[in-house]
């Protein structure tokens, strides 16, 4: 519409200068239907003016986009002011309509009425106040119909009790959001992401629908959420966007993960309580509500694919795994070593339940490690470590051996250090089969266990395992032999004890004590001492030579001579008699 120009209307020469004629564009209704009622201020009216003017305007009214003519010479100052106000209000309405169309809020839906631009009437100016009163109800109607833009209520037919319950739940959602925004890590998510300021040029390519807690609070305050599900969806979308754009391990990812768990811990109990009250209020037969709860859970879990892929997410997913494990038989969770014997025991599992029931209790008394695996502790890393430690070792003929874990490598390195020196030759042969580049510094070889290939690592593991088995077997056989062999020559031992008692009753001044030389020769090996090219051999049964005489109190006695002759008293020559270690120990005790 072409706006009319109003300037210096109160000047006396204004009407003569401008010709007192203004035009405006015609809209959708005839503006000349009440032209006859306008008062004529021309003292010399033209009798043909009314007929020709009306006929011309009637011709214009048949065309859209024509112009309506206003003869400003026939209006007083007050009427011109009213006309100016009228044009100003129409212009304001057109601008508002244009802004709504450009912003996209102008939609035509069922139950929504597009506000029509009020028709411009050339009625008597004294009726302008009546037209203003007509505009009032239309504006109220417009505001009332705008509510049709909201999403439909998913909680069935509206009634006062249901609306009151829903309002209470939305109030609880508002309280949960306030607590969440006051968290010490929530400052990252309270405002929209500053893509330009942070230089995140690919943010909108990765995140298709940005969301933040501040926007969620604004939408909640304006009443855009008609159900708690929509509110929870936007809150979860905020944290999902952060975990989608930021890789795992960064601070933002960790903060979003913890805040999402914190939100679920507050929202899920409140929503379950709301569902129970809703079902109690309406009844299961009044509306198809049973499909709502699984739909909500499906939306809740399908909306967070990273949480299922990255074991990110923690506590709720592990609890679901617990429920599945408790429902299913515990046989699939056992390691392969335990599953295979059970298959051998039951080659043909019969279908009747009485036969299946005895099979279920068999895996129930497993070692304690199996109980930890079934219980699934909250820390996902601990579960993964426990499962990795229970992996079976590959066989030697297996072409595709699994990679050795870090725990197994460290254990292998400790076992290699405990090998005796006689096994190092075989160890070097195994290493040089596939690793000829090992650097050798004299007798030492530097071995980096991380640089050794997987095949060699498993061969070294088998070598160490076989050695440990052999060593434990030898030790076990020696222990059994010592326990099963009875003590030999019990009589000689008794005689030795009696002889020792008799010698102690004798002269206590003698330093050398004869304890009886009845100990069997086979119990102690011969001792050879090389000195000055001469070898002196003394049997373990020989006693100490003292004062040139060798006597035996218990029977046969023999004194070992040195290579040159008999023993003489008080001689300190190299050919002195050699005492057995057993005799020396007894002398030291005395």
From Swiss-Prot:
Subcellular locations according to the entry: Nucleus
One Pfam family matching this protein: Bromodomain
Domain Bromo: 164-270
Region (Disordered): 125-160, 282-400, 476-590
Domain NET, first and last residues per copy: 394-475
Biased composition (Low complexity): 537-562
UniProt GO BP: DNA-mediated transformation
Skewed-composition ranges (Acidic residues): 509-521
Cellular component per GO, a single term: nucleus
PROSITE patterns attached to this UniProt entry: BROMODOMAIN_2 (PS50014), NET (PS51525)
Pro residues biased stretches: 347-369
InterPro entries per UniProt: Bromodomain (IPR001487), Bromodomain-like_sf (IPR036427), GTE_bromo (IPR037377), NET_dom (IPR027353), NET_sf (IPR038336)
Keywords: Bromodomain, Nucleus, Transcription, Transcription regulation
Comment field on protein domains: The NET domain could serve as an interface to localize different proteins or complexes to chromatin.
Protein name per UniProt: Transcription factor GTE7
């Amino acid at each position: 519409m072409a706006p009319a120009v109003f300037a210096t209307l109160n000047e006396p020469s204004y009407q003569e200068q401008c010709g007192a004629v203004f035009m405006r564009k015609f809209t959708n209704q005839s503006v000349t239907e009440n032209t006859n009622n306008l008062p004529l201020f021309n003292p010399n009216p033209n009798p043909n003016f009314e007929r020709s003017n009306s006929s011309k305007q009637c011709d214009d009214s048949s065309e859209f986009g024509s112009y309506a003519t206003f003869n400003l010479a026939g209006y007083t100052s007050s009427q011109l002011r009213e006309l100016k106000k009228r044009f100003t209000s129409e212009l304001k309405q057109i601008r508002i309509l244009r802004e709504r169309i450009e912003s996209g809020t102008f939609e035509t839906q069922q139950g929504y009425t597009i506000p029509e631009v009020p028709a411009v009437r050339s009625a008597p100016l004294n009726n302008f106040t009546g037209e203003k009163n007509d505009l009032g109800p239309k504006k109220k109607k417009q505001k009332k119909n705008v509510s049709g833009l909201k999403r439909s209520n998913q909680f069935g037919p509206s009634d006062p009790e249901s609306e009151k319950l829903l309002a209470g739940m939305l109030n609880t959602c508002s309280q949960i959001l306030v607590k969440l925004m006051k968290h010490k890590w929530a400052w990252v998510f309270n405002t929209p992401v500053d893509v330009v300021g942070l230089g995140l040029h690919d943010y909108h390519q990765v995140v298709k629908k940005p969301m933040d807690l501040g926007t969620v609070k604004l939408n909640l305050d304006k009443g855009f959420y008609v159900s708690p599900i929509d509110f929870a969806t936007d809150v979860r979308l905020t944290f999902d966007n952060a975990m989608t754009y930021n890789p795992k391990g960064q601070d933002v990812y960790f903060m979003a993960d913890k805040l999402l768990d914190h939100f679920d811990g507050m929202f899920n109990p409140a929503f379950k309580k709301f569902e129970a009250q809703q079902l109690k209020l309406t009844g299961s037969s009044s509306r198809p509500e049973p499909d709502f709860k699984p739909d909500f859970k499906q939306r809740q879990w399908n909306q967070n694919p990273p949480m299922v892929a990255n074991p990110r997410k923690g506590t709720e997913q592990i609890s679901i795994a617990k429920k599945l494990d408790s429902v299913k038989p515990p046989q699939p969770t056992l390691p392969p070593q335990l599953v295979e014997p059970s298959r051998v025991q039951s080659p043909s599992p019969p279908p009747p339940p009485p036969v299946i029931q005895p099979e279920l209790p068999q895996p129930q008394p497993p070692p304690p490690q199996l109980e930890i695996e079934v219980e699934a502790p909250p820390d996902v890393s601990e579960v993964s470590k426990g499962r990795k430690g229970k992996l079976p070792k590959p066989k030697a003929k297996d072409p595709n051996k699994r990679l050795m874990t870090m725990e197994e490598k460290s254990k292998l390195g400790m076992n290699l250090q405990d090998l005796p020196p006689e096994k190092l030759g075989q160890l070097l042969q195994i290493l040089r089969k596939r690793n000829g580049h090992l650097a050798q510094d004299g007798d030492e070889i530097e071995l980096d266990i991380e640089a050794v290939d997987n095949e060699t690592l498993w061969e070294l593991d088998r070598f160490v395992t076989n050695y440990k088995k052999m060593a434990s077997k030898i030790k076990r056989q020696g222990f059994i032999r010592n326990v099963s062999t009875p003590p030999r020559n019990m009589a000689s031992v008794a005689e030795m004890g009696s002889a020792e008692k008799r010698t102690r009753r004798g002269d206590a001044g003698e330093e050398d004590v004869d304890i009886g030389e009845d100990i069997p020769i086979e119990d102690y090996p011969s001792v050879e001492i090389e000195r000055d090219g001469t070898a002196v051999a003394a049997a373990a049964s020989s006693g100490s030579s003292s004062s040139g005489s060798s006597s035996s109190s218990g029977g046969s006695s023999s004194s070992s001579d040195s290579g040159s002759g008999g023993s003489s008293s008080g001689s300190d020559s190299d050919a002195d008699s050699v005492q057995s270690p057993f005799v020396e120990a007894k002398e030291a005790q005395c």
